[in-house]
Amino acid sequence: MLKSIKSSGVTAVLDHDGFNKRIRVVRYDGAIEKALPDIVAAAKEENAEKIIVYAKQHDEPILAKQLFAPEGYLKGYYLGHSACVMVRYLSESRRQTDSYTEEQEIIEAIYRTAPRLRNDSTPVFTMRKAETNDMYQLSMLYKKVFRTYPTPVFDPAYIEKTMNANTVYYIMLDHDRLISAASAEINPELGHAEITDCAVLPEYRGHSLTSFLIEALEKEMAGEDIVHVFSLARASSFGMNAVLYHSGYQYGGRLINNCFIAEGLENMNIWCKQL
C-alpha cells in the first residue's frame, strides 16, 4: 500500500508491504535524512524486517551513516538518473542467505554464453496486448506457475485494477488458451518501467515466449517515450536471468531475501536496459 509522507524539507512515497514484511521508499524529493526516523519507526511498529530506499546517488553517504547498505543499482530510475537500492535490515534472519555463491555461479555461467541477438522471427503462437476480459485467464496462469507471488496477481480484480492504472500486459495464446504473459509497470512521473509478472506454463517452455513478450513490451514502452526499463529476476532461476541477459539487459546487483515468490522468500537479481 502506497502512502505519502511530508515533513520539513522532504516528501516521500512509501510502499508499506505487509505481505513481504518490508517498507520501500519508492521515490522522494528533498532531504531524505529528515524522513528516516519516521520511516524506521514505522517499520519497527509494523514488524517489517527490511527497509529499502531507492536512493539518489548523492544521498548514498547520508544513508550509509544511517546504517543502510547498497545492494544494487537501477539505471535510469529517476528520469534517466540511477538509483542505488540501499537497505537496512531489522531482522538478522532476513539478512542471511545460504544460496549467494550458488546464485553467483548462475550469473557466471550465463556470462560465459555469447549474447544472442534478436532476429526477425515470430512466435509460433498468437501474441497480443491483453484486455480486461483476459484477467481471469491471467490469474489462473499465475496460480499454475507460482505457489506464492509478491503481488496479488492470483486475484482477477487486482489485475483489472493494474490494467486500468499504468500496467500493460502482453499475452501468448495457443488457440484460446493463455499460455504465457508478461507486464510492464509504467512510472510516467519518473520515466521508467518495470518488466514483471513473467510466466510460462511448464509444458510450453523452450519456445522463447518470454523473450517475445519482453520485446513487445519494450516496443510499447518506446512508443510511450519510456526508455529506461528494469526487471527483477529470481536469483535461483537460470532461465529468467538468461532471458534478460540475452535481451540486452545488464546485471545490477542482488536484493537479498527481497520478496515471497515461487518457493518462498527469495533473492532477486536486478537487470536494467536503456531502449
Swiss-Prot record:
Induction: Up-regulated during sporulation, under the control of the sigma-E transcription factor (SigE).
GO molecular function term, any single one: N-acetyltransferase activity
Signal peptide stretch: none
Record keywords, A-Z: Acyltransferase, Transferase
Phenotypic effect of disruption: Deletion of the genomic region encompassing the entire yodT-yodS-yodR-yodQ-yodP-kamA gene cluster has no noticeable effect on growth either in rich or minimal medium, does not affect sporulation, and does not cause osmotic sensitivity or influence the compatible solute pool of this soil bacterium.
Ranges of residues in domain N-acetyltransferase: 125-271
Pfam families in the cross-refs: Acetyltransf_1
Biotechnology: The use of YodP from B.subtilis for N6-acetyl-beta-lysine synthesis opens the bottleneck for the large-scale production of N6-acetyl-beta-lysine to investigate its properties as a compatible solute.
Enzyme Commission number, as recorded: 2.3.1.-, 2.3.1.264
Catalytic activity: (3S)-3,6-diaminohexanoate + acetyl-CoA = (3S)-6-acetamido-3-aminohexanoate + CoA + H(+)
More info: N6-acetyl-beta-lysine is not synthesized by B.subtilis as part of its cellular defense against high salinity.
Family in the record: Belongs to the acetyltransferase family.
Job description of the protein: In vitro, is able to catalyze the acetylation of beta-lysine to N6-acetyl-beta-lysine, an archaeal osmolyte produced by methanogenic archaea. Its physiological function has not yet been elucidated.
Protein name, entry field: N-acetyltransferase YodP
Encoding gene, per UniProt annotation: yodP
